[in-house]
């Protein structure tokens, strides 16, 4: 399974772009692996309002008779500019007074309270679970056609040992 998507809205000054990718494959009937990527970049309508989000992950699974494993790794990286709001409300409440003789002005020309202030959040998540089954094999008949019978070995689990690992790391930076 593969899916690639690209979205773009508005122009290069205040538009948004998003790229998404999903990939998964089964190597055989027991083992599968895949990844995903999601990247979003928005420039914002006002000054110092851009955002950049990157999310990605890897995953894998194995399902055997005696051993099972499921694994996932996620990474989230979020970077947002902070503008503290519009510096003077009259740009919204009385725009003609603030246009300085111009007929109109653009939203990104409106002064904001803050510039060059950023929030940067990152997080990493790992989850893995394993299971080992103890048991025995027994013979089972399997009819291939009307006139033939095949004997196969089937595993019968009696008890299991399970191990789970989870790690979550979160960080935040504020850049002025």
For every predicted segment, state its role.
Residues 1-23, 44-45:
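Short strand-turn segments of transmembrane beta-barrel domains in outer membranes
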Residues 4-8, 37-39, 71-75, 159-169:
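Transmembrane beta-barrel strands of outer-membrane/channel proteins
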Residues 21-25, 35, 58-64, 126-134:
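Residues on the lipid-exposed face of transmembrane beta-strands in outer-membrane beta-barrel proteins
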Residues 30-33, 66-71, 137-140:
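Repeated loop/turn-to-beta-strand initiation elements of outer-membrane beta-barrel proteins
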């Amino acid at each position: 399974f593969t899916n690639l998507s690209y979205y773009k809205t508005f122009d290069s000054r205040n538009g948004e772009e998003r790229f998404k990718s999903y990939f998964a494959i089964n190597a055989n009937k027991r083992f599968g692996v895949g990844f995903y990527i999601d990247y979003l970049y928005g420039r914002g309508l006002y000054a110092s309002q851009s955002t950049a989000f990157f999310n990605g992950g890897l995953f894998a699974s194995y399902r055997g008779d005696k051993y099972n494993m499921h694994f996932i790794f996620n990474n989230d990286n979020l970077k947002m500019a902070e503008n503290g709001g519009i510096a003077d409300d009259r740009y919204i409440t009385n725009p003609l007074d603030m246009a300085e003789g111009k007929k109109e002005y653009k939203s990104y020309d409106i002064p904001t309270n803050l510039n060059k202030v950023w929030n940067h959040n990152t997080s990493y998540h790992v989850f893995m679970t394993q299971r080992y089954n103890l048991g025995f094999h027994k013979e089972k008949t399997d009819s291939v056609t009307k006139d033939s019978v095949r004997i196969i070995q089937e595993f019968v689990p009696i008890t299991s040992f399970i191990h789970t690992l989870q790690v979550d790391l979160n960080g935040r930076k504020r850049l002025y």
